[in-house]
Amino acid sequence: MDRIEIEIKLNRDRAWLLERLGEMPTDELMMPRTFSEHDPESRWSFADHFVHTTLIERNWNAMFRRHLTGEQGLEPRLRGDGSPQSMDTIMASIHAWTEEWKAEHSGKPFIELVRIGQAVRAETLELLAELSDEDLTSKIPGAPWADGTVGGIMAANADHGRMHYGWAEEDPVSTADSP
């Protein structure tokens, strides 16, 4: 994927998501829609899913920078003895981390969540402008997203927003609460 395709995808999908969420009444935007992967008492709204994607995009930008400066892109996930953590342990820590971010931003007006997302998206586009074509095709060892390249993962931010919108739209909370 080249830089033009990446920028188009990022902008098109961000606009798609903002149009849908921006048209929603506040009560619908903030209504619990999905179950937390971390806290059995917590529920996620469309707004929570939206701000979650900002956290991941910010984290991926840091990963790209580490990788391109010769550091390990993916942060090592090791136990105290130096052996790799299990996937269950890794996912539990990721879910706790994202739940903490969700709680930190819960109840904020949607326009504030958009502003936070705009700041991170600006960083993403600035990074895209700084990267060479070779940088965009550089593979991040162990990265499970997209094709594993910096450019592919960067473009996957767009897919991530649509994926979370879809999960919130399914609304398993209402189904579970129905008699």
Task: Please state what every model-predicted region is.
Residues 7, 11, 15-18, 30-95, ...:
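Short, contiguous alpha-helical
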Residues 9, 103-119:
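A short, structured beta-strand-centered segment in the mid-to-C-terminal lobe
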Residues 26-27:
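Short amphipathic alpha-helical segments and their helix-coil junctions
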Residues 2:
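Short Lys/Arg-rich basic patches
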Residues 37, 97-105:
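A short small-residue
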